[in-house]
Amino acid sequence: MSCCGCCGGCGSSCCKPVCCCVPVCSCSSCGGCKGGCSSCGGCGSCGGCKGGCGSCGGCGSCGGCKGGCGSCGGCGSCGGCKGGCGSCGGCGSCGGCKGGCGSCGGCGSCGGCKGGCSSCGGCGSCGAASPSCVSPAAASPAVQALLLPVQLLQALLLPAQLLLVQLLLSLLLLHDCGSSCCPMSCSLPIYCQREI
């Protein structure tokens, strides 16, 4: 069976029925689509690797999508690794999403690791989201709604606490000084002069 008879992109030894009919794309061997594609849409159906990359090197090897994509959307559905990264290195290897994302949304659904991190290193490894990505500014609205009444209560109780401390201090000074001096002029017990 001939391959790419319309454009001659693949060599005569290639026996795949589906070929990319653009001269800039070529298949190096029959068993796997290797090398990057500049503007032909990437590897169409080579080992399950779908989705093309603009100028980032394409898919490294069929069955294992390696290397990052600049701005082409990354690897579509290569081994469960979904979602592309702008300029953070993309998905390290299909089946194990490694490396952090700057501001592109992180790893979509790679082994349970969901949500992106802005500058904390992204998702370290699939199956465990990095705990350092949680920040107080990124708290959920429900948590913020629960914290607001507590903060208001603390603000209201602060003057009452100060007044109570001042009252207790005055009572202590009055007890120590006796009737020889009033609490206003008797600041410390050492200055009190008791009548003999």
From Swiss-Prot:
- The domain of life is Eukaryota
Q: Which UniProt keywords apply?
A: Keratin, Repeat
Which residues form the sequence repeats? 14-17, 20-23
Can you quote a single GO CC term? intermediate filament
Q: Which portions of the sequence form the region 2 X 4 AA repeats of C-C-X-P? A: 14-23
Subunit structure and binding partners? Interacts with hair keratins.
Which family is this protein grouped under?
Answer: Belongs to the KRTAP type 5 family.
Q: Function of this protein?
A: In the hair cortex, hair keratin intermediate filaments are embedded in an interfilamentous matrix, consisting of hair keratin-associated protein (KRTAP), which are essential for the formation of a rigid and resistant hair shaft through their extensive disulfide bond cross-linking with abundant cysteine residues of hair keratins. The matrix proteins include the high-sulfur and high-glycine-tyrosine keratins.
Q: What is this protein called?
A: Keratin-associated protein 5-3
Which species is this UniProt entry from? Mus musculus
